[in-house]
């Protein structure tokens, strides 16, 4: 009898240990490939918009930063509510959906809400949003880096020693009030200061916070330049774009490129072809462009990648 009980306890312990190992082994990647097929960008975008609207998503903005791509930014009451409960949660108030033509193949993809929830240290997992996107658009696989990251690693991510974490943003400008900060950003983006223009704006309910998605076009800060060097794999990571500016209270912030790019391309090499070295000029140029877009002035920064 005692031996039988002991065997039962051992079996239960082994099963529990296996379950824990499976749970611990769950790995996340920044993007989800929804579908692939043939056709044209315009028709596919129209179809995707219809599916997203039927699933309850609101289109916050869209743009085509370079040929053969279209990017949609969607939000929902659930996303905005989750953003309101998290410090700097506005970064995740919109999820990005991309339609990319690579050769004869049209790829539909979107940001992985669960990955982004950890990347932006949200107080919500955004699993419901992930489920709704999957139901609306499909889910063939997560993708991005060759190897995924555990949730805790995403939440604490930085590319390497000396590079910024999520909670070390760039302060672009500061004003006397939230209303003034938002007004200046709107005006500066309309004037395309720094080569930046507005793609979308999402206001976070119940707090003085708004996130702006911006199209960057100037020199080394440009979307086309950066992606031309780092987005080279067969399945494109187009939904990395657009870059964000966050107005929170009286201040205007942006995530440093050394974090914002790396969190979506964590396995990008430091040197060689298709590496951070090829966009060495980008971090400072992006920060400068966003400072102008925030109504601020250029500051010198001695650091690059």
Say what each PLM segment does.
Residues 1-10:
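Bacterial N-terminal signal peptides that target proteins for export
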Residues 20-24:
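Sec/Tat signal peptide C-region and signal peptidase I cleavage site
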Residues 70-112:
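Mid-chain, structured segments of secreted extracytoplasmic proteins
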Residues 74, 83-88, 203-216:
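Compact, glycine-rich, soluble single-domain proteins
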Residues 108-149:
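Hydrophobic alpha-helical segments and helix pairs
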Residues 209-305:
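A cross-kingdom marker for long, charged
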